[in-house]
A protein has these predicted regions:
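Arg/Lys-rich, alpha-helical DNA-contact motif
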Residues: 2-7, 13, 46-150
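Minor-groove-contacting beta-hairpin "wing" of winged helix-turn-helix DNA-binding domains
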Residues: 39-46
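Short glycine/proline-centered loop/turn elements that form peptide/ligand docking sites
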Residues: 11, 18-21, 40
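Residue-level "edge-of-site" marker
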Residues: 25, 38, 72
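The alpha-helix within a helix-turn-helix
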Residues: 12, 26
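Conserved hydrophobic/aromatic packing and binding residues within compact polymer-binding modules
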Residues: 22-25, 55
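Beta-hairpin "wing" of winged helix-turn-helix
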Residues: 31-39
């Protein structure tokens, strides 16, 4: 990995998104440049490229919309903060409170994913029902054709 800050085009290329998309994600608050050049140009670290890749994964591979992506990223950011706080904390009661908050966040994310899975399952069932109707209709049309030809 490179320690040199990346320009916007380099970061976009590494994450396989367009510069316009990267800027749009910034406008939405999903991503922030790690630094700016003296001239004000955006500069990105490898962590920023990893976040861009995570946004793409959530959006393109898992089918999350941008509001859902924001929810996941916010939760993941908070979980990262909690992880650091846990390891910096010596007090067991404070650690317990940190873990309880992490569990609550994780539970909310699981519920959101479950709701999405249920919506997808419903959509899949609708598509299967349509396929069954189309198949039955096609079979009926073939039977009619065969009856008139034969």
């Amino acid at each position: 990995m490179s320690a040199r800050p990346l320009r916007i085009g380099e970061a976009a290329a590494r994450a396989a998104v367009s510069v316009r998309t990267l800027r749009y994600y910034e406008e939405l608050g999903l991503l922030r440049p790690s630094a700016y050049s003296p001239g004000g140009a955006r500069r990105y670290a490898e962590e920023d490229v990893a976040r861009l890749a995570r946004i793409r994964e959530l959006k393109d591979l898992l089918g999350f919309n941008l509001d859902e992506v924001r929810t996941v990223l916010t939760a993941e950011d908070r979980l990262g903060d909690l992880r650091a706080a846990y390891h910096a904390e010596d007090d067991r009661a404070a650690q317990q409170a940190i873990v309880a908050e992490a569990l609550e966040i994780n539970t909310r994310l699981q519920a959101a994913v479950q709701a999405k899975l249920e919506r997808l399952a419903t959509f899949k069932a609708e598509l299967e029902a349509k396929a069954d109707r189309y198949g039955a209709s096609l079979a009926g049309l073939r039977d009619e054709r065969d009856a008139t030809v034969g």
